[in-house]
Amino acid sequence: MSKIKIMCTSTGCIDYAPERYKSLGIDIIRIHVFFNGKEYREGFDLDPVEFYRQLETIEDPKNHLPTTGMPDTEEIMECFDRAIADGYDEAIVYVLSSALGGTYNKICLVAKEYENKLKIHVIDTHLTCFGEGLLAIKAAEYAAKGMSAEEILKETRWSMDHQEFIGVDGKLDYLIYNGRLKGGKAFMGQLL
């Protein structure tokens, strides 16, 4: 039976409840946030409370919104190397939607370098935030029960296909300014 390591990008928000992800042994690959002239690793150098506090102080959101960047190659490699050092045979990495940036592709490229060392399954969740994180949590619970990687992937893919999230954003302006909400959708959102 393979020993399976579960990983997730920081956009999965699982570190909002650190005792939960730590008890399940989930590793987090940190996305970078560029804000107010500084670079942070999401959820590590900049916690959510401080992030939102700083966000509220922005005087000109059109020109000063935070931006994100992919994790460093070295950080991804550290996660994979740690899994190998800890005796894992396989890793399943749940990644934020590839439609939102290049993180999925970057992790896939790094994973190819480990083909003979660790069997890595990189999963484009087509989600972000808690939807992504819930998949990693369920996968870690399944791994703890002794399920195989194939069984875990089957269960979490089913969940991906059947998840629906509804979110409320009190300030659609941020989604419009950063280009995530455009055209008619932006117009309709502002009417609501």
Could you describe each region identified by the protein language model?
Residues 3-5, 10-27, 31-38, 86, ...:
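Mixed-charge interfacial surface used for oligomerization/domain docking
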Residues 38-93, 98-101, 105-106, 112-113:
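Class I S-adenosyl-L-methionine
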